[in-house]
């Protein structure tokens, strides 16, 4: 981690955009936790959107539950952006008083591609990619499919962590869309084979000024860490059990499942009391 910080400036003050690519059970969330552990004292606030939180209770161990959501809704991201605008203004004003306010925050979108058409085309998502660093917002996006991010947004990614992938088609997609610094696809596959065993990862650093391959590509393995907590202590003071918006939503009732404009169901009672 120290080498990546030194060589690639993975620093909370730089508010990097980080993408983690890997199929299920390759350690994406574990890697995100490892990265956050290394900057645990840097962020007073944050936002987590993870569809599996109600099942695995992963992020609530180190992020206040009030900051975690398991259903992507554009309004949540928009409100977070507004929060960062206000924090940035407060920071600029606080410098004059000598009591500097810390505006930094993190945002995690954990496997949100179930709502891909919704979030990737949403204006607030594009704003985070294009301008998040200007609002002191570090963003970590985990995803299983390499093309989950459109080309115009990929150019704003600072770090790409590539985890184990044995499907040749997906390897080629990763190579063509994220790893063009490798002279050949075969060389890229050799690096992947060497760097992604045992939950290790291949790291591509896009914000270096060098064109040398050794300055842009690294190996990294996430570590297990003792319990820790992110965010300002005031956010933990009244921390309560996580409430799932996904489980509370009544999306599976008969009315919502009925096809649009379909005629209502009609029950016909037959002689003898049966239904047809």
Show the residue positions of the predicted features:
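P-loop/Walker A phosphate-binding loop and immediately adjacent motor/lid segment at beta-alpha junctions
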Residues: 172-210
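Conserved P-loop NTPase motor module
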Residues: 1-18, 197-276
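Short acidic, gly/pro-rich beta-turn/loop elements at beta-sheet edges
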Residues: 56-58, 213
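General N-terminal targeting signals
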Residues: 63-65, 157, 177-179, 191, ...
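Active-site regions of enzymes building and remodeling cell-envelope glycoconjugates
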Residues: 60-73
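Short, conserved catalytic or adaptor-binding loops enriched in Gly and charged residues
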Residues: 59-62, 153, 194
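Conserved P-loop NTPase motor cores
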Residues: 4-8, 15-44, 51-55, 74-186
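Intrinsically disordered, low-complexity eukaryotic regions enriched in glycine, serine
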Residues: 10, 49, 66-68
């Amino acid at each position: 981690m120290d080498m990546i910080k030194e060589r690639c400036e993975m620093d909370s003050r730089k508010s990097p955009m980080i993408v983690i690519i890997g199929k299920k059970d390759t350690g994406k969330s574990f890697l995100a936790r490892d990265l956050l552990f290394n900057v645990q004292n840097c962020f007073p606030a944050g936002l987590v959107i993870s569809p599996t939180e109600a099942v695995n209770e992963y992020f609530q161990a180190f992020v206040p539950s009030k900051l975690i959501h398991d259903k992507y809704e554009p309004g949540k991201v928009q409100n977070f952006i507004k929060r960062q605008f206000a924090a940035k203004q407060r920071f600029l004003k606080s410098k004059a008083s000598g009591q500097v306010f810390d505006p930094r925050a993190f945002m995690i979108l954990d496997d949100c591609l179930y709502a891909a058409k919704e979030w990737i085309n949403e204006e607030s998502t594009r704003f985070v990619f294009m301008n998040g660093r200007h609002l002191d917002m570090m963003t970590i996006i985990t995803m299983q499919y390499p093309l989950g991010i459109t080309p115009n947004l990929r150019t704003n990614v600072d770090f790409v962590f590539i985890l184990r992938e044995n499907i040749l088609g997906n390897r080629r997609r990763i190579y063509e869309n994220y790893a063009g610094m490798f002279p050949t696809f075969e060389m890229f596959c050799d690096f992947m084979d060497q760097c992604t065993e045992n939950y290790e990862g291949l790291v591509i650093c896009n914000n270096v000024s060098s064109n040398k391959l050794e300055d842009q590509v690294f190996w990294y393995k996430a570590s297990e860490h003792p319990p820790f907590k992110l965010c300002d202590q005031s956010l933990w003071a009244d921390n309560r059990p996580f409430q799932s918006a996904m489980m509370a939503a009544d999306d599976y009732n008969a009315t919502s499942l009925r096809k649009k404009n379909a005629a209502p169901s009609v029950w016909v009672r037959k002689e003898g009391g049966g239904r047809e």
